Amino acid sequence: MVDPQLDGPQLAALAAVVELGSFDAAAERLHVTPSAVSQRIKSLEQQVGQVLVVREKPCRATTAGIPLLRLAAQTALLESEALAEMGGNASLKRTRITIAVNADSMATWFSAVFDGLGDVLLDVRIEDQDHSARLLREGVAMGAVTTERNPVPGCRVHPLGEMRYLPVASRPFVQRHLSDGFTAAAAAKAPSLAWNRDDGLQDMLVRKAFRRAITRPTHFVPTTEGFTAAARAGLGWGMFPEKLAASPLADGSFVRVCDIHLDVPLYWQCWKLDSPIIARITDTVRAAASGLYRGQQRRRRPG
């Protein structure tokens, strides 16, 4: 029978190996030898009866290891808060919090979250909003801005509002490729822009406009600055947050490709823990998102 008591140092070793990608790096973080890290992982695997780490470069957690990663991260957070509450030198060590957020939110409203969080160490991961919840499932992030309204196991969900996206391009691009309007035939030939291969916003706009998918040439530009520069240079049309598109539309650098827009619901998912830090970050995120559209989003109570 498996002993239900899990060893803290073994969980810490698992978390360090997966976060840093190797046993050597984990050993350096934990101030032990690589063989000691290996032994801790082996002992934990023997205890639970399953392989927890895929020993590749970089190392990654198996499906069985993911719940233990989440446990390790949550245990470390609660331990840090308990030590801080006790006071003394231990309270001087700031807690590290990992958050996943999409680039468009970071470029528009999320930076306001940083105000008043100087007592924590933030590890912000930029992820597409349709995929950021993956880091919650893997136990990497304690919170994520996501389009997923169904709670990840062990998490609460808070609706934030809707981010409005507009299809825009440079005026010369529209004159060259869309002179007769944003028709299905023109959309099939006019290059579009996408953040990466996970970015489905342009596909959503096309389906909304024509009620079907249309294959088209696409440039992939995975930074906010690069995406904007590509649109200004006339490489393609793309979906921009209304806030980012407002100034270029006002000065004539951008024009609307069509009158259709997309409202993308965003949610804040975070660990379901009685944690002052999580509560404070959640309140800060919700306040920062107060400028998002709220009219069309379905209301739901936090999970």
UniProtKB/Swiss-Prot annotation:
Induction: Negatively autoregulated.
A Pfam family it matches: HTH_1
Gene3D superfamilies tied to this protein: 3.40.190.290, Winged helix-like DNA-binding domain superfamily/Winged helix DNA-binding domain
Top-level taxonomic group: Bacteria
GO molecular function, one term: DNA replication origin binding
Functional summary from the UniProt entry: Positively regulates the expression of the exporter LysE and represses its own expression. Activity requires the presence of a coinducer, lysine or histidine. Acts by binding to lysG-lysE promoter region. Also up-regulates the expression of ppsB, ppsC and ppsD, by binding to the upstream region of ppsB.
Domain observations: Contains an N-terminal DNA binding domain (DBD) and a C-terminal regulatory domain (RD).
Natural source organism: Mycobacterium tuberculosis (strain ATCC 25618 / H37Rv)
Application notes: A wide array of epitopes was recognized on Rv1985c in TB patients. Those epitopes could specifically discriminate TB infection from BCG vaccination. These results indicate that the peptide pools selected from Rv1985c have the potential to diagnose TB infection by a method that may be routinely used in clinical laboratories.
DNA-binding residues: 23-42
Keyword DNA-binding: yes
Annotated effect of mutating residue 42 to E: Leads to dissociation into monomers
Record InterPro entries: ArgP (IPR017685), LTTR (IPR050176), LysR_subst-bd (IPR005119), Tscrpt_reg_HTH_LysR (IPR000847), WH-like_DNA-bd_sf (IPR036388), WH_DNA-bd_sf (IPR036390)
UniProt protein name: HTH-type transcriptional regulator LysG
Encoding gene, per UniProt annotation: lysG
Record lineage: Bacteria, Bacillati, Actinomycetota, Actinomycetes, Mycobacteriales
Domain HTH lysR-type as annotated: residue spans: 6-62
UniProt family annotation: Belongs to the LysR transcriptional regulatory family.
Oligomeric form and interacting partners: Homodimer. Two types of dimers are identified from the crystal packing: a DBD-type dimer, where the dimer is mainly stabilized by the coiled-coil linker helices, and a RD-type dimer, where RDs contact each other in an antiparallel, side-by-side alignment.
Single GO biological process annotation from the record: negative regulation of DNA replication
